[in-house]
Curated annotation (Swiss-Prot):
The keyword Mitochondrion does not apply. ATP binds at residues 124, 175. NCBIfam families: PRK09355.1, thiM. Pathway: Cofactor biosynthesis; thiamine diphosphate biosynthesis; 4-methyl-5-(2-phosphoethyl)-thiazole from 5-(2-hydroxyethyl)-4-methylthiazole: step 1/1. It comes from the Bacteria. Keywords: ATP-binding, Kinase, Magnesium, Metal-binding, Nucleotide-binding, Thiamine biosynthesis, Transferase. InterPro entries: Hyethyz_kinase, Ribokinase-like. GO terms for biological process: thiamine biosynthetic process; thiamine diphosphate biosynthetic process. The keyword Metal-binding applies. This is Hydroxyethylthiazole kinase. Its cofactor is Mg(2+).
Length: 278
């Protein structure tokens, strides 16, 4: 099964460059540039429109829509719901990044409102965010996962991901030291990445943007999520080797470089994937 997954991931890396999916990303001003750049780096075409009077139209012609709660407001929630509903109506996949879910009442209610009105196809977040969405007690530390949640065993994280995937009929990606991805039936643990990724603002948001790019070129959103997370985590390893002893700025640039150069051979050489039957 692992070889089959990696074959599909490798093909998708090529297909996204051929199809050049238009990815409508309603995201936050902190990470918007990096999100746009990683979409471009893998071959997609980003649009970052968030004005309520145009989001429905843009979503309707897009290949994927990414809704990111990094900086939230009533107008942003309205725009996300309008874009999400338009995407649903036009069979466009929706990726939801519930940044900071669990940390504050308005943010929590916003996440709940979006999910009550929009059918999402991929949810990507850290373990604390995903636990909150799943209705479990979480201990979010700002927009970061709490240490207690991060120290949950992978077996428990797989259960959380799988149950939420079944509940919402979507793919769930929990990113962290190890990454858990489930569509409710298929479950994988991805064990790539480097701790330096946590020191760059927005690598989670970038991972969600990559989910949009790959989902926009595939109808298998489980594979799209795996492709996105492996691309980010393996690129983190490569970027660390290139920037070792230099500093964070070089790591950041090297990360984008590595994402832009990702291909099937690199994935098959470096990916560490474990399938979980449950």
């Amino acid at each position: 099964m692992i070889n089959e997954i990696l074959d599909k991931v490798g093909r998708l890396l090529e297909e996204v460059r051929t199809k050049k999916p238009l990815v409508h990303s309603i995201t936050n001003y902190i990470t918007a540039t990096d999100c746009a750049n990683v979409i471009l780096a893998v071959g997609g075409s980003p649009t970052m429109a968030d004005y309520v009077k145009e989001v429905e139209e843009i979503a309707s012609i897009s290949s994927a829509v990414v809704l990111n709660m990094g900086v939230i407001s009533e107008k942003m929630v309205e725009a996300m719901i309008l874009a999400g509903k338009s995407a649903n109506k036009n069979n466009v996949p929706v990726i939801f990044d519930p940044v900071g879910a669990g940390v504050a009442n308005f943010r929590n209610k916003s996440a709940e409102k979006i999910l009550s009105e929009v059918k999402v196809d991929i949810i990507r977040g850290n373990i604390s965010e995903i636990k909150f969405i799943c209705g479990l007690r979480s201990e979010t530390k700002g927009v970061d996962a709490s240490e207690r949640d991060m120290n949950m065993g992978n077996d428990k994280k797989v259960i959380v991901a799988q149950e939420l995937a079944k509940k919402l009929n979507c793919v769930v990606a929990i990113t962290g030291v190890d990454d858990i991805i489930s569509d409710g039936k298929r479950n994988v643990i991805l064990s790539n990445g480097h701790k330096m990724l946590a020191n760059v603002t927005g690598t989670g948001c970038m991972s969600s943007a990559l989910c949009g790019a790959f989902a926009g070129a595939s109808d298998d959103y489980f594979i799209a999520a795996i492709c996105a997370v492996l691309t980010m985590s393996i690129s983190g390893e490569i970027a660390y080797e290139k920037s070792k002893g230099i500093g964070m700025g070089t790591f950041h640039i090297s990360l984008i470089d590595a994402i832009s150069m990702m291909n099937e051979n690199v994935i098959k050489e470096k990916a560490r994937v474990t399938t979980i039957n449950r």
